[in-house]
C-alpha cells in the first residue's frame, strides 16, 4: 500500500478530463495535478522544447514526492515520455497513448477505418499509428489529422458554440468523408471536452477517448507494484502556471465541487 499522491500533468486543462475517471475507478487515490496553462499549447512546439517543458514539470512533481507520474497529454506522451522515463528510471510512468491504443485494438475490427485526431506534434511523431500496429499489425486503414485550432479554443472555454462547430467541420468534414472513417480516436485529452459536440455533428461515429482509458493503466501499474492507496485523509491539489478563470471553472465543473472545496494553486516553473 502507498498513500502518496499520483502526479498528473498536461500542457493545459485537457488532462483534467482524466481525473473523474481515475477518482471513480480508484476512490482512495489522490492527485497532484499540474497544468502548464501559461505555455500551452505544446502541439505546435519543437520536440526539444516539449521535452524540456516535460522535465520542468516532472522535476516539480518529483519534489512533491509523488508515487507515479502520468503524462495526461498526448503530445508529451508522443514526444516527451521517453525522456521522462530516462530521467526517472525508478518512477512508474505512463502516458495516454498506449491505453487508448489498447482500446482501439479491443474495439475495432480489422476492416474498420480509424481516424486519429491530434496535435501537429503527435501526428508528426506517428505514435498512434505505430502503437496500434504493434497491437494489430494487419490494420491497414489508419488515418490521422492535426487539428491545431482546437486546443487554443478549448483553453478559452469555447467547446460547443458556432465557432467550435465551424472549426470541427473545417478540419473533419473532408477527412471523415474521404477516408470513410468509422471510429474517431481523440488523440488529445483536450478533445474530450468537445466530445458531445463531435457526437452531435457526426452521429453514428464511434469515439475512443484517451482521457477515459488511462485510469485502467494507472490501476494496473500500481496494483502490479503493490502501490494502490488505502483509505486515507490526503487531499488532491491542482496547480497551474497561469491560474486562469477557465482553469478554475473546468476543475469545478469536472469534479462537481465549488472552488472553496478544492485546493487550487498557482505555480510558476521559472517561465
Task: Label each region the model flagged.
Residues 1-271:
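Non-catalytic structural scaffold of enzyme domains
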Amino acid at each position: 500500500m502507498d498513500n502518496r499522491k499520483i502526479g498528473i500533468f498536461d500542457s493545459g486543462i485537457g488532462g483534467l478530463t482524466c481525473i473523474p475517471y481515475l477518482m471513480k475507478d480508484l476512490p482512495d487515490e489522490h492527485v497532484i495535478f499540474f497544468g502548464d496553462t501559461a505555455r500551452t499549447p505544446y502541439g505546435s512546439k519543437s520536440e526539444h522544447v516539449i521535452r524540456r517543458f516535460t522535465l520542468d514539470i516532472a522535476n516539480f512533481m518529483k519534489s512533491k514526492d509523488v508515487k507515479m507520474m502520468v503524462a495526461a497529454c498526448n503530445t508529451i506522451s508522443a514526444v516527451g515520455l521517453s525522456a521522462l522515463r530516462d530521467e526517472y528510471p525508478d518512477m512508474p510512468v505512463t502516458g495516454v497513448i498506449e491505453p487508448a491504443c489498447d482500446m482501439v485494438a479491443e474495439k475495432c475490427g480489422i476492416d474498420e477505418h480509424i481516424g486519429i485526431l491530434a496535435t501537429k506534434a503527435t501526428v508528426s511523431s506517428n505514435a498512434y499509428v505505430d502503437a496500434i500496429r504493434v497491437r494489430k499489425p494487419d490494420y491497414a486503414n489508419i488515418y490521422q489529422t492535426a487539428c491545431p485550432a482546437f486546443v487554443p479554443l478549448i483553453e478559452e472555454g469555447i467547446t460547443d458554440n458556432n465557432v467550435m462547430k465551424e472549426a470541427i467541420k473545417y478540419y473533419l468534414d473532408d477527412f471523415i468523408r474521404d477516408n470513410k472513417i468509422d471510429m474517431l480516436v481523440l488523440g488529445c485529452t483536450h478533445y474530450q471536452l468537445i466530445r458531445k459536440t463531435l457526437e452531435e455533428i457526426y452521429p453514428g461515429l464511434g469515439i475512443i477517448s484517451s482521457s477515459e482509458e488511462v485510469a485502467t493503466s494507472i490501476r494496473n501499474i500500481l496494483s502490479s507494484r503493490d502501490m494502490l492507496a488505502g483509505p486515507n485523509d490526503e487531499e488532491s491539489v491542482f496547480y497551474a502556471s497561469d491560474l486562469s478563470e477557465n482553469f478554475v471553472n473546468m476543475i469545478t465543473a469536472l469534479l462537481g465541487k465549488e472552488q472553496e472545496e478544492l485546493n487550487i494553486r498557482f505555480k510558476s516553473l521559472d517561465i
